[in-house]
């Protein structure tokens, strides 16, 4: 690590974090070193932001597990809340016409998909690939009992096309790794100028135009009056690239995609080893010692 990078790290005021594949290990648990280091950052006055493709309701539960009080940027930045109880900093949703067009294209594709709006996840085409239902939706239908999943999952086409397409933050097409259907979908929707990303090799995410994790970092820096050069961001997948590019100190996980590592200034150890926490303790928190 260069002296220049060390000097920049000493000035970090905001830590922006992806969740899956970054803060979480492969068993969807948070390594103790990650919890400990983030709590220490918070105690020392640094701002924390969880920036994920996950829903706000789920991220709120994750923040509790981590024992921190971060800003929550859900659905890749479509909804940004100052904390568990708000207030709302920024919110971007599809228009009804946009949502109908995306939903119709997804239905016609024959791919399993989800639509996310406040407090609800609507499932589309569940009968097409029933094996994907339990993997991605956990329970069909009804409210998930696990307190980390406090939102209603809806498996009802009438409700999807009724209430479900008002105020949608994100659509997600789900399939097997590198499903060719993802590219076909993106091509069919290319003239809508949507924001498109992938949180894994098994999905393709569609958000309103201009919404991505980099947008979330920019919004937070304006809100908090923090220069982007004083942001350290951690990520592993291609949907994290805009966030890393918006941060002065982009950190990619060792388990991350090569394209993500290419934009990083620092590589963190594997997520299963608590790579985020190890980097924070070695390079950010030690400045106070």
Describe the residue ranges of each PLM region.
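Short, acidic loop-to-helix structural element flanking the phosphoryl-transfer center
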Residues: 28-44, 91-98, 153-157, 208-222, ...
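Short, structured coil segments at secondary-structure junctions
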Residues: 66-68, 75-76, 84, 189-192, ...
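Active-site phosphate-binding/coordination module
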Residues: 29-138
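Mg2+-dependent phosphoryl-transfer enzymes with acidic/Ser/Thr/Gly-rich catalytic loops
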Residues: 5-14, 30-31, 204-289
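Active-site metal-binding loops of divalent metal-dependent hydrolases
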Residues: 21, 54, 77, 235-237
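Short active-site oxyanion
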Residues: 45-49, 69-70, 170, 229-230, ...
């Amino acid at each position: 690590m260069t002296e220049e990078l060390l000097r920049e790290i000493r000035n970090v005021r905001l830590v922006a974090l992806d969740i899956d594949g970054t803060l979480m290990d492969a068993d969807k648990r948070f390594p103790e070193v990650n919890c400990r280091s983030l709590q220490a950052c918070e105690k020392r006055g640094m701002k924390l932001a969880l920036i994920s493709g996950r829903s706000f309701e789920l991220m709120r539960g994750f923040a509790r597990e981590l024992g921190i009080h971060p800003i929550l940027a859900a659905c890749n930045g479509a909804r940004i809340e100052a904390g568990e109880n708000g207030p709302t900093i920024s919110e971007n949703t599809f228009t009804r016409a946009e949502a109908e067009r995306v939903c119709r294209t997804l239905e016609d594709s024959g791919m399993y998909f989800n639509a996310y709006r406040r407090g609800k996840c609507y499932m589309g085409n569940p009968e097409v690939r029933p094996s994907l239902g339990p993997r991605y939706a956990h329970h069909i239908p009804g409210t998930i009992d696990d307190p980390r999943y406090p939102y209603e999952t809806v498996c009802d086409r009438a409700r999807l096309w009724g209430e479900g397409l008002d105020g949608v933050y994100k659509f997600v097409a789900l399939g097997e790794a590198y499903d060719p259907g993802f590219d076909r979908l993106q091509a069919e929707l290319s003239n809508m100028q949507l924001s498109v990303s992938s949180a894994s090799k098994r999905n393709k995410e569609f958000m309103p135009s201009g919404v991505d994790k980099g947008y979330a970092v920019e919004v937070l820096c304006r809100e908090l009056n923090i220069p982007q050069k004083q942001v350290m961001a951690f990520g592993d997948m291609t949907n994290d690239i805009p966030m890393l590019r918006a941060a002065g100190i982009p950190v990619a996980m060792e388990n991350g995609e090569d394209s993500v590592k290419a934009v990083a200034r620092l590589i963190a150890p594997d997520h299963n080893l608590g790579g985020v926490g190890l980097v924070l303790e070695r390079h950010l928190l030690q400045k106070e010692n």
